Amino acid sequence: MKKILITLTVLFAVIDIMAQEHLSFKGIPIEGSMTEFCQKLKSKGFTSIGRENNITLFTGRQATVGVTATDDGKNVFAVVVLFDPSGEWNTLVNTYDYYKDLYTRKYGKPTISKENNPAHLDSNTALMAEVHQGTVVYGSAWEVTGGDIQLSIEKSSGVYEGMVMIRYRDSQNIEAKIQNDLDDI
């Protein structure tokens, strides 16, 4: 009986520790205030390029990184990586496939993956027109310890341009934000 109680206690302690783990971006747990998280990004070599509505934009090597926090800025809950826009379908797909392969190697098969461009022609113009119209569905997601990671091809603000986007969402802090928002309505 004593062994069973000890085993159950250890099991619940391990589950509790796992449940409290935050998702990380570039080795930085997605937690804490906007200021704290951004300081950690700066120490990793990112450069701040602006802040608006609790979304801070940083620039890294080939991408812009957005950090999203609660309205009061006290709790970071998501990080979004936006790769440079492109008007070339092959560039978008090659970037998407490269990161999909990396994440699959690290986290295993995606929890969900759908890749469809409904263009009837295989020309760059036809493919990018579908991106521009928002009819392309190209995305994969991984449920990982502490949250989820989503990879997708999205329409960008330029005409016939798209971009690859990676979203990191910390499940604990997303849930805390939702609870705060529910309290406000």
Roles of regions detected by a PLM:
Residues 4-15:
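Sec-dependent N-terminal signal peptides
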Residues 20-52, 84-185:
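Non-cytosolic coordination micro-motifs
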Residues 41-78:
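N-terminal, post-signal-peptide region of Sec/Tat-exported proteins
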Residues 58, 65-67, 79, 149-153, ...:
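Hydrophobic beta-strand residues in large extracellular and virion-surface proteins
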Residues 77-85:
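Short, compositionally biased strand/turn segments
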